[in-house]
Amino acid sequence: MAGARAGAAELGRSLVVVYPELGEPFRQVFASIIDGIEDKLGGSVMSLAVANNANPAGVAEDIRRRDIQVLIGLGRGGMRIAAALAGELAVLAGCVVSVQESEARSFPVHTLAPDPGLLLARLKRLKPGTRRVHLVYDPKLNAWLVKLAREAARAEGMELLAQEAADQAGALRAYTQLLASADPARDALWLPQDPTTVDDSTVLSLVLREGWNRNMAVFSSHVAHVRRGALFSLYPDNREMGRSLATAAQRLAAAPKAAVPGALPLRQTLAAINIRTAAHLGIDVAAAQSGFELVYPSN
């Protein structure tokens, strides 16, 4: 046990966390993640805030001059620095939204997309009669997530009906058609983190309005959508995410060549529910509220 703690502390001294220099609330998000990393490693770690206009090559050169073995890049700014050093250091990225598969070919990228298995288990608990889950997605961004979602749906006794859309016009057509033909008693609609197929004005307004009118469950990977009327969402537990990134960094330091590149879903989650929507769908609100950290509308 003491040896493990000593090893963790030693890693902390040779690890750097790089993140974008942003205002609140993002600064506090990164601070909580770093707190989790330090808690797991049992000591402070070097952290480096990088301005948006910083040259990744210059930042990478600064890091090369330090005695660093592992780099954790947070957000897109941190991921750019990780990419610049991927051939030299053990690197991983975390707290990243909407990752193209091409961006995750060289190192692991821990995204903010909630794990489909966690989302679908939550859906099954709230709406046990759900048999089919509809999803409209951009394959350049979310093909990896859809693969995981198909497996998760099978495990929950559901079928995933995923439609590809290359632009917002195609997404609107797909949503209009599926909302017109879906069976609200057995179908649900999932809004992923996908800027191509889910925008906060046209698409969200259409889906939430028609979902409400047809008594169909709409859940989302964006917690802000719950306030607008989506049934539920999962969102990051930032400190626990930091602890998980520290564990991944420990594995990476121990066996750099064993690291598997690619996008990974978020498993360190908290949950939000809209009880007005739940009541409208005939869900027992008192029972539904347990296990949710955020409840809308708030009293």
Which ranges hold each PLM region?
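Periplasmic-binding protein-like
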Residues: 18, 64-75, 134-136, 185-199, ...
